């Protein structure tokens, strides 16, 4: 099974577990579009490449923006995962809700090119529901809030189908970007995405919690160009993340009036199921 996400791509092999967990990123030669490296090796090049090399994210805001690059990424990662150990496997690929038929065929073609005997696609909210252990075939409303790297998808599932779906183009990567901008604006330092992600994981939160920590961050002083350290409070980081969190909450609120009353009653009893990397933000539940 393949989870093709905006930020990361995971491959799971039945009976083995997750065998690939790589950033959805490629380093490409600008002149001939040849691929230099992908995944984690490509991520190491962020901020360190010459003008002749381009870092490409084939998915943007939850949709496939670079079809050929997405196809190459899937093909390469599948070849690594499958190797010679599996002969003509059956593959299930998670795709964003609302993916176009052209995008879907392209990903299926890439999977077939690795020697797959059969290729199936499943929408990400449905896969998240199954992975959460929910009985999706019951006449019962389950709300999935899948906070990915570039998109948050909200879906209400009942009787094996998506009854109502809504999405907002914000996710974990937007949290990282807003922290970079906030540090530049409020503290006059520049940091890369790796440092911003560390801040998010260390002290980021959706709401206040007990014994909130501090974190010291080193970046480049915008004015003098020298290293500069800043001590950050968890409350300040939370305030910086607030616009993204509010966008996600608003998307959930919009989904409820579009849902049949009986299913809303079910959701009121059980709440929503949070999935995706963005759901790991402290106090997100």
Where do the protein language model's features map onto the residues?
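Nucleotide/phosphate-binding catalytic cleft detector across ATP-hydrolyzing
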Residues: 1-147, 155-272, 279-285
């Amino acid at each position: 099974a393949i989870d093709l996400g905006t930020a990361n791509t995971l491959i799971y092999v039945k009976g083995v577990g997750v065998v690939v967990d790589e950033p959805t990123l490629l380093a490409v030669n600008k002149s001939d579009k040849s691929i230099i490296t992908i995944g984690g090796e490509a991520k190491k090049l962020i901020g360190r490449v010459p003008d002749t090399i381009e870092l490409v994210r084939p998915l943007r805001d939850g949709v496939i923006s670079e079809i050929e690059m997405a196809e190459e990424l899937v093909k390469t990662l599948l070849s690594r995962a499958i190797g010679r150990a599996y002969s003509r496997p059956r593959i299930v690929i998670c795709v964003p809700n609302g993916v176009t038929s052209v995008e879907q065929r392209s990903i299926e073609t890439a999977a077939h090119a690795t020697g797959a005997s059969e290729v199936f696609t499943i929408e990400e909210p449905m896969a998240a529901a199954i992975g959460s252990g929910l009985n999706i075939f019951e006449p019962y409303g389950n709300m999935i809030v899948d906070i990915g790297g570039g998109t948050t998808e909200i879906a209400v599932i009942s009787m094996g189908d998506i009854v109502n779906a809504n999405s907002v183009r914000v996710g974990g990567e937007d949290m990282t970007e807003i922290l970079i901008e906030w540090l530049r604006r409020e503290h006059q330092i520049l940091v890369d995405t790796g440092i911003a992600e560390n801040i998010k994981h260390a002290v980021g939160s959706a709401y206040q919690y007990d014994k909130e920590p501090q974190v010291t961050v080193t970046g480049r002083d915008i004015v003098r160009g020298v290293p500069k350290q800043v001590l950050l409070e968890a409350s300040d980081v939370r305030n910086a993340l607030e616009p993204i969190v509010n966008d996600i909450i608003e998307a959930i609120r919009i989904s409820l009036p579009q849902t049949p009353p009986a299913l809303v009653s079910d959701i009121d009893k059980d709440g929503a199921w949070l999935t995706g990397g963005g759901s790991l933000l402290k106090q997100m539940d």
